[in-house]
UniProtKB/Swiss-Prot annotation:
Gene designation: H2-Q9
Name under which the protein is recorded: H-2 class I histocompatibility antigen, Q9 alpha chain
Species whose genome carries this gene: Mus musculus
Region described as Alpha-1: spans on this chain: 22-111
Annotated TM spans: none
One matching Pfam family: MHC_I
Predominant localisation class: membrane
Length: 200
């Protein structure tokens, strides 16, 4: 009986490993934290392929740049790192503005510390196609607004987020995000899986 149970557990574990081995994900997490009296908000960005952190940007670094966090990313040339650094700095500026906007929506003073988070990414199925894309924002550690599974509409959790939703609908932001998640995100994931094929 014990041997049968052990074999069943091993078989279940192998099934989980095989299922997981065929699926992969690319995720980015961005966070901005206001620091009254200390200058601009702190901004950090990290990227993961599956459960492996592969890039990081920290606005408080001596020379803020997108940096490799996985050995296999060291294969990328200087043009890649310059481009990714510029993208991260663009996110940093945009995020700081969004943090100020959220503070105004919630009638909060600039004197306190506030946090804005953004998470997005794509999951690839074992067939190499998009399994799901996702994008969501949180303010002060609570859900704020999220792109729905259809990648066309938004869920806004409160009145402040409704303002953002209306602005984004008018600007066609969902369409741009959908194009990124279905296109660039998946292409990037395939590239990173190739670069890290020995360890991922």
């Amino acid at each position: 009986m014990a041997l049968t149970m052990l074999l069943l557990l091993v078989a279940a574990a192998l099934t989980l490993i095989e299922t997981r081995a065929g699926q992969h994900s690319l995720q980015y997490f961005h966070t901005a934290v206001s620091r009254p009296g200390l200058g601009e908000p702190w901004f950090i960005s990290v990227g993961y392929v599956d459960d492996t952190q592969f890039v990081r940007f920290d606005s408080d670094a001596e020379n803020p740049r997108m940096e490799p966090r996985a050995r296999w990313m060291e294969q990328e040339g200087p043009e890649y790192w310059e481009r990714e650094t510029q993208i991260a700095k663009g996110h940093e500026q945009s995020f700081r503005g969004s943090l100020r906007t959220a503070q105004s929506y919630y009638n909060q003073s600039k004197g306190g510390s506030h946090t804005l988070q953004w998470m997005y990414g794509c999951d690839m199925g074992s067939d190499g196609r998009l399994l799901r894309g996702y994008l969501q924002f949180a303010y002060e550690g609570r859900d704020y607004i999220a792109l729905n599974e259809d990648l066309k509409t938004w869920t806004a959790v409160d009145m402040a987020a409704q303002i953002t939703r209306r602005k984004w609908e008018q600007a066609g932001i969902a369409e741009k995000d959908q194009a990124y998640l279905e296109g660039t995100c998946m292409q990037s994931l395939r590239r990173y899986l190739e670069l890290g094929k020995e360890t991922l």
